Amino acid sequence: MKHIEIYTDGSCLGNPGPGGYGAVLLFNQHSKELSQGFVHTTNNRMELLATIEALASLTETCKVDLTTDSQYVKNGINQWIKNWRKNGWRTSDKKPVKNVDLWKRLDEQVGRHDVKWHWVKGHSGHPMNERCDVLARDAASGKSLLPDEGFQG
């Protein structure tokens, strides 16, 4: 099984507002960068989408070390999602899970791979996190912004 390192970040100019995600995938001596901007979205949606798109870009099952600066993503996938799924995608206080469209997609992608999650403090000088931040911010301020079809706000 191939071992891939993935680094992700999301950015939003306004929250909600124009947003983007960035991801860097490393395999042996190869690297691949992914990014996309959206017209109107949130930071959390971009953090989720970065991980989804990075995992979805893998064409076979892989062992993945995924590093994010989002506690929301890391805690959601490691702690909260099992109960959300069990409770019909509702939180412990019976409210609908926010960003459920993306959580379902992430759940599906994580199921395809052996993922180990890592957290790094954002803007702390971690080279790959900083690169993802640049990709995400550049995408958010770019000209080819897409609609975020799942955004409700």
Swiss-Prot record:
Binding residues for Mg(2+) 1: 9, 47, 69
UniProt keywords, alphabetically: Cytoplasm, Endonuclease, Hydrolase, Magnesium, Metal-binding, Nuclease
The keyword Transmembrane belongs to this UniProt entry's keyword annotation: no
Co-factor note (free text): Binds 1 Mg(2+) ion per subunit. May bind a second metal ion at a regulatory site, or after substrate binding.
Amino-acid positions noted as binding Mg(2+) 2 in the UniProt annotation, renumbered to this chain: 9, 133
CDD domains: RNase_HI_prokaryote_like (cd09278)
UniProt GO molecular function: magnesium ion binding; nucleic acid binding; RNA-DNA hybrid ribonuclease activity
UniProt EC number: 3.1.26.4
Gene Ontology CC, one term: cytoplasm
Domain RNase H type-1 as annotated: residue spans: 1-141
Family matches, as InterPro entries: RNase_H (IPR050092), RNaseH-like_sf (IPR012337), RNaseH_domain (IPR002156), RNaseH_sf (IPR036397), RNaseHI (IPR022892)
Cofactor(s) for this UniProt protein: Mg(2+)
Main location: cytoplasm
Keyword Hydrolase: yes
GO process annotations (BP): DNA replication, removal of RNA primer
Assembly and interaction partners: Monomer.
Role: Endonuclease that specifically degrades the RNA of RNA-DNA hybrids.
Family to which the UniProt record says this protein belongs: Belongs to the RNase H family.
Name the record gives this protein: Ribonuclease H
